[in-house]
């Protein structure tokens, strides 16, 4: 997928570089970046992803999504400046994987008593009917059988 297609899903402040390059994957962990990666620099509680941009470029990243303008380099890499890297990552990942949430049906269970029982019964019913199902509750979390 081309950078320009992928970033069409996010709010961009500024672009420096060629957006016509092919992206092989999206990474937010600098240790997993390889040739063709788009690296998303996120500010965390223990580390700042912006500190790893140079390392990612050296490993072959073709694009970097970042919040801090001072980290934009001179390399032949596309830098995409955004206000919120976390939000940009979520939107790009959603698009990258074919917008899966648009294909999902969601059932919410609210009330005072019986929510877990009702949700579990619905999970088992839909599973028996052959649907791919998930269950998120305060007791268990399942995606299909796992």
Where are the language model's segments positioned?
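Phosphate-binding loop of NTP-binding sites
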Residues: 7, 87-146
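N-terminal leader/targeting and accessory segments in enzymes
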Residues: 1-91
């Amino acid at each position: 997928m081309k950078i320009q297609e992928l970033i069409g899903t996010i709010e961009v402040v500024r672009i420096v570089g060629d957006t016509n390059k092919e992206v092989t994957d999206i990474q937010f962990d600098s240790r997993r970046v390889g040739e063709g990666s788009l690296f998303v620099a996120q500010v965390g509680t223990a580390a700042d992803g912006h500190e790893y941009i140079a390392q990612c470029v050296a490993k072959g990243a073709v694009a970097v999504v970042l919040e801090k303008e001072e980290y934009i380099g001179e390399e032949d890499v596309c830098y995409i400046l955004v206000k919120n890297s976390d939000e940009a990552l979520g939107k790009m990942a959603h698009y990258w994987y074919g917008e899966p949430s648009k294909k999902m049906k969601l059932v919410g269970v609210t009330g005072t008593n019986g929510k877990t029982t009702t949700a579990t019964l619905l999970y088992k019913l839909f599973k028996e009917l052959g649907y791919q199902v998930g269950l998120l509750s305060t007791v268990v979390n399942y995606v299909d059988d796992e």
